[in-house]
A protein has these predicted regions:
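Short solvent-exposed coil/turn linkers within tandem alpha-helical repeat scaffolds
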Residues: 54-62, 88-97, 123-135, 156-169, ...
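Residue-level recognition of tetratricopeptide repeat
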Residues: 35, 70, 105, 141, ...
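N-terminal leader/linker segments that initiate helical-solenoid repeat arrays
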Residues: 20-70, 74-76, 83, 98, ...
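Residue-level detector of the short coil/turn that links helix A to helix B
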Residues: 41-42, 76, 111, 147, ...
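Catalytic glycan-binding domains that act on GlcNAc-containing polysaccharides
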Residues: 328, 379-384, 389-398, 402-404, ...
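Hydrophobic/aromatic side-chain positions at a characteristic register within alpha-helices
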Residues: 38-39, 73, 108, 144, ...
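"A position-specific structural signal for the A-helix of alpha-solenoid helical repeats
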Residues: 32, 67, 102, 138, ...
Length: 745
């Protein structure tokens, strides 16, 4: 649940009376339909329903307009929400300030902080008690965004006076940040409970800044480790030297953080890099946040300024490789090869670049690395690449030599496992079933990472040899020992067992302590304090190992329902460590918090809802804001280009900022999945592979001998990530069926 969702839950209660007394007109029916869609987790559909009704009705009553604005807020179309409400003659009198609160939220999202604060204040004046307190917190946040610290402090004080005991520590923290009287501010910060206490040092610095003591504020920010805030404040007061040290120190120390990403913008705008170390620090931060091209330019400038350190050369090699400049990458890695610390990495990466170049020296470089650095974690990969390269050329005798050395030296390594399967696949193509079986048995004996895969294929080979009873015994043993894994479920079908059914006992209700905690999180979300709610969730995750099984299950169930899917699943895995045979744990590891929305979108496009939820679980773990390193967004993890293309095909209005609206993302994801299923003749395995890797490579893979057999098709997917993804999606579909579909006669 987000800040906007929290506000609209709050506003909904205020709107009930007005809605109940509205006339039973066509717009009213549309509003009811929209509310039903919203409650089913389909806010975009709700907004579209009301938009269509509005186009048919020249005169709309206040209830319909407010419901439309709320729907637009849920759909993150904030400008539309605002335009529906601004200037309405009934705005200030509607449902005890409910319309004012919706307008204020839209304005806040649009960056109109002063207008938002004024409208929150007007809404607050029309109510009492906890509703007034929640609106006061939102008003304070808006005043803070507008830079009006005194008004923000007054609003937070009013919120505390109206009574929000569940979140008082967090409101105290906000109030202290904007209080000019440091004595009062420091009293507010005294004895804060965790996790709010972790923010006290930063709040103390902000209080000093509110009081005008910038020198003390700078020191407090330094002590709190808030380098970005320190740099901004130092810049504002003309201390560019301190700001520079803070910015570039942050980017060098923690380039992957959000603060480092923000530091890039500050540095480029006010303090561009001057020295090679600054350029390298900037490049590292750029690289981690989608700026590889700019990072490469900064590293090249550092090299031209005389930076010849191995660390910079290795970074340059990485960036050149990303850009396809393989010759430049090879030279950079070669120059770093003599370094005592990074030399091995440089030699290995140079060898990989030579492979990409098709250089005749690639084999010698890989084998030389594997022989010179046998204890390096990359040595098995080097040997695998040698075998893989020769195998792709059809030289299976040469491939077997290197794969054999890999298996002998690193028998339990993942690459050894992959080598066994490459050799086994070739043996099967050559009709050497006994050789393939020996390789599969070796994987089992070694306890390799693909041992369940090997056992499944041993069953298939046993069946091909005519030993039906032996094959059945192998598969039944696999069913017992890997009951919820992909190959255990696959073996289940081979022996004609009924579909897996997991009749889990009801999940426990929350204990008083857990219920109190959820009350605090819900109140934080209603108040618009999303970051504080996230801090509370992180605190629960940090102490999960100390909790009992029922607490973990209750927390996981509640968090999944509130949109914290990844956190819920993490708690589920923690519960599995404590009680591995408790079937209730699976409902936390494989939750279905948005079931109605998934089923509705699947039905609209004629796809299996179990397949769609299996993909969502694998792609985003039900995190509507999920962002992948490749730029995929939302529940169904769509790339912006894919989302836009799919929307165009559906004649759906789409803007990039809407991509994480939950049901719009699901809508486009379901449409994309249906298109892939149609393209590949209904083959779920191929469609799942294409969802992960794209349609073009899957088309090539389907043209290979043996691809008609789904088992062989999956095993021969050359991308390890995609191979694992397809298995996981198919396993997920079986488990969601086992957990959530009632048995039928």
């Amino acid at each position: 649940m987000t800040r906007t969702a929290g506000l609209l839950l709050f506003v909904a209660a205020a709107s009930l009376q007005s809605t109940a007394t509205a006339q039973q007109t066509s717009p009213y029916v549309a509003a009811q339909r929209a509310e039903s869609l919203r409650l089913a987790g389909r806010p975009w559909h709700a907004a579209e329903t009301l938009l269509a009704a509005a186009a048919r009705e020249p005169r709309l009553n206040a209830t319909f307009v407010v419901e439309g604005a709320k729907a637009e807020l849920y759909a993150r179309r904030y400008d539309r929400a605002r335009s529906l409400l601004v200037g309405q003659p009934w705005l200030e009198d509607y449902a005890d300030g409910a319309a004012l609160a919706v307008l204020a939220e839209a304005e806040g999202r649009l960056g109109l902080a002063t207008q938002a604060a004024a409208h929150y204040a007007a809404a607050r004046a029309r109510v009492r008690g906890s509703r007034a307190a929640l609106l006061a917190v939102r008003e304070g946040l808006a005043w803070e965004a507008a830079g009006a610290r005194d008004s923000a402090a007054a609003a937070y004080g009013a919120a505390r006076a109206a009574g929000l005991p569940a979140i008082d520590a967090w409101v105290r923290l906000r109030q202290a940040r904007v209080t000019r009287d440091t004595a009062v501010a420091f009293r507010l910060l005294a004895d804060l409970p965790a996790p709010a206490a972790r923010e006290a040092a930063s709040a103390r610095a902000q209080a000093l800044l509110s009081a005008g003591d910038s020198v003390a504020a700078l020191e407090a920010l330094a002590q709190a480790g808030r380098s970005l805030d320190l740099a901004r404040l130092a810049l504002a007061h003309g201390d560019s030297s301190r700001a520079r040290d803070a910015l570039y120190g942050l980017m060098a120390r923690a380039p992957e953080t959000d603060d480092a990403a923000a530091a890039v913008g500050v540095a480029l705008a006010a303090l561009p890099p001057r020295t090679p170390p600054e350029r390298v620090a900037l490049a590292r931060a750029m690289k981690g946040h989608g700026g590889a091209a700019d990072a490469r330019l900064e590293v090249e400038r550092a090299l031209r300024q005389g930076d010849s350190s191995a660390a910079t050369l290795v970074l340059a090699g990485e960036l050149f490789t990303t850009a396809g400049r393989y010759r430049d990458a090879e030279r950079a890695y070669r120059s770093a090869a003599a370094d005592p610390v990074l030399g091995a990495l440089a030699i290995y990466r140079r060898a990989r670049v030579l492979v990409r170049l098709g250089d005749a020296g690639a084999s010698e470089a890989l084998s030389g690395f594997a022989q010179s650095f046998p204890s390096d974690t990359a040595a098995p990969t080097a040997l695998y690449m040698l075998g893989d390269m020769l195998g792709d050329r059809g030289d299976w005798a040469g491939a077997a030599r290197w794969f054999g050395e890999l298996i002998a030296r690193y028998p339990a390594d993942l690459r050894a496992s992959l080598a066994r399967f490459r050799l086994a696949a070739q043996a099967l193509r050559d009709g050497l079933r006994d050789s393939a079986a020996a390789l599969f048995r070796a994987e089992v004996v070694a306890g390799g990472p693909q041992r369940t895969t090997a056992r499944f294929w041993l069953g298939k080979l046993t069946l091909l040899a005519g030993d039906t009873a032996g094959a059945r015994a192998t598969w039944l043993a696999l069913v017992r020992e890997d009951s919820i894994g992909y190959y255990g479920l696959r073996a289940r079908r081979e022996v004609d067992l009924p579909p897996l059914r997991i009749a889990a006992a009801p999940l426990p209700g929350p204990s008083p302590a857990v219920a109190t905690w959820f009350g605090r999180v819900d109140t934080l979300l209603l108040a618009g304090l999303d970051t504080a709610a996230q801090a509370e969730v992180r605190a629960v995750l940090a102490r999960a190992a100390q909790q009992d099984i029922d607490a973990l299950l209750a927390w996981g169930d509640g968090l999944a329902a509130r949109g914290f899917g990844p956190a819920a699943v993490r708690l589920g895995w923690q519960a599995a460590l404590k009680s591995p045979n408790d079937s209730r744990v699976l409902r936390i590891i494989f939750p279905w918090p948005n079931r109605r929305a998934v089923e509705a979108e699947a039905a609209e496009f004629g796809v299996d809802p179990l397949l769609l939820v299996a993909i969502v679980r694998q792609e985003s773990v039900f995190d509507a804001q999920a962002l992948s390193p490749a730029g995929a967004r939302g529940l169904a993890q769509l790339l912006p280009g894919t989302a836009a293309l799919t929307a165009r095909g559906l004649d759906v209005t789409f803007y990039p900022e809407w991509i994480t609206v939950p049901d719009l993302n699901l809508h486009l994801g379901a449409a994309h999945l249906q298109e892939l299923l149609q393209r590949f003749g209904g083959r779920v395995d191929a469609a799942a592979a294409a969802y992960n890797a794209g349609a073009a490579p899957v088309k090539r893979w389907l043209e290979r001998p043996g691809a008609d057999d789904p088992d062989e098709f999956i095993e021969l997917i050359p991308y390890q990530e995609t191979r694992g993804y397809v298995r996981a999606v198919l396993r997920n579909r079986e488990l969601y069926h086992a957990l959530y579909v009632a048995p039928t006669n």
